[in-house]
Amino acid sequence: MAETDRATDKPAGAPKPAKTASPERVAAFRTGLSAEARAAALLIAKGYRILAKRFRTPHGEIDLIARKRGLVAFVEVKARASLDDAAYAVTPRQQQRIIDAAQAWLMAHPDHAELELRFDAILVAPRSLPRHLMAAFDASP
């Protein structure tokens, strides 16, 4: 049986929201984790291997980093009430933070720098299948 945190009855080492978070923030955190799990499952079903989840840098966070053959995809996961709302939630400012975080990840993993790189988004909404937008944005200025 997997080891659990006795205080929360969750798997040991699972990310936890801040202790002072409001109920709304806790709900958003859990929704995000669920959306990221659905997105990772979709990528795995499509033949990707997940290299990293929730990769954090001072520049920003990348929800998922996945590889399929000679391609590395940096994936932003957005969960909203509708897929259209999720699509509009990936702002230019956020795109730049993801690009900066991807550069930091590549510095730490130089063996992946020569592969094809792509910035994807996976949109998640209730009662809908997740939508994978390949090349949702690029690093070009």
Curated annotation (Swiss-Prot):
Entry similarity comment: Belongs to the UPF0102 family.
Protein name: UPF0102 protein BRADO0179
Transmembrane segments: none
Organism of derivation: Bradyrhizobium sp. (strain ORS 278)
HAMAP family reported in the protein's UniProt record: UPF0102
Residue stretches of biased makeup (Low complexity): 10-19
UniProt xrefs under Pfam families: UPF0102
Domain of life according to the entry: Bacteria
Alphabetized GO MF terms: nucleic acid binding
PANTHER family, per the entry: UPF0102 PROTEIN YRAN (PTHR34039:SF1)
SUPFAM superfamilies: Restriction endonuclease-like (SSF52980)
